[in-house]
Amino acid sequence: MTKEKKVPRRQLILEALARELEQNPGERITTASLSKAVGVSEAALYRHFASKAKMFEGLIDFAEESVFIRINQILKEHSDAQTRCARILYLLLVFSERNPGITRVLLGDVLVGETERLLARVGQFFDRFETQLKQILREGEMRSEGRPHALDSAISANMMTCLVEGLLHQYLRSRFKASPLQHWEIQWRLLSATLFPDS
């Protein structure tokens, strides 16, 4: 007879927070409502997290780990810049669609009134994402895939990041009804024709 693995309380709290953020778009989540959702006292929440800011940090940590570990796998599996960029952008859109509550955190929607450090953390998430794209484009140029690039790699990376962030904002604005992947194939085709004209 196999024993069910017990989920750590810390993880249960983060899952409940993400769920509350998804189910209550536009609303602030209080520790009182969160403790009710988890089924523990507020004191029990604070035994695992010193503050609500630490809970949000836990969700940011999860997003960073999930996205950037997968990006590293994509870089190992594919060598051409166009495929790498396409898969990395798609990855973030899929992650967002599957984790609407965390999307609210990454876009800073629920961080108003929280510590400045949290806004800096989500800023770093997108900066790191954009830097990764820029590096891919530069490596592609060195291998002459861009021959030479129609646009500067920094501008191209910024354009891709802006498109994805914009799609995530639309997803949030629709209260998670309009998928960020809704027109992605066509959008990517139009964008890649500009960024990779020789492909």
What do these predicted ranges mean?
Residues 1-8, 72, 144-145, 173, ...:
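N-terminal intrinsically disordered/low-complexity leader segments
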Residues 9-17, 34, 59-63, 67, ...:
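Generic hydrophobic, amphipathic alpha-helix propensity
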Residues 30, 104-106, 146-150, 180:
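Short, hydrophobic secondary-structure boundary micro-motifs
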Residues 58, 73-98, 153-160:
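Hydrophobic alpha-helical connector segments
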Residues 65-68, 72-73, 116-143, 154-158, ...:
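Amphipathic alpha-helical packing segments from all-alpha helical-bundle domains
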Residues 97-117, 169:
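Amphipathic alpha-helical segments used for helix-helix packing
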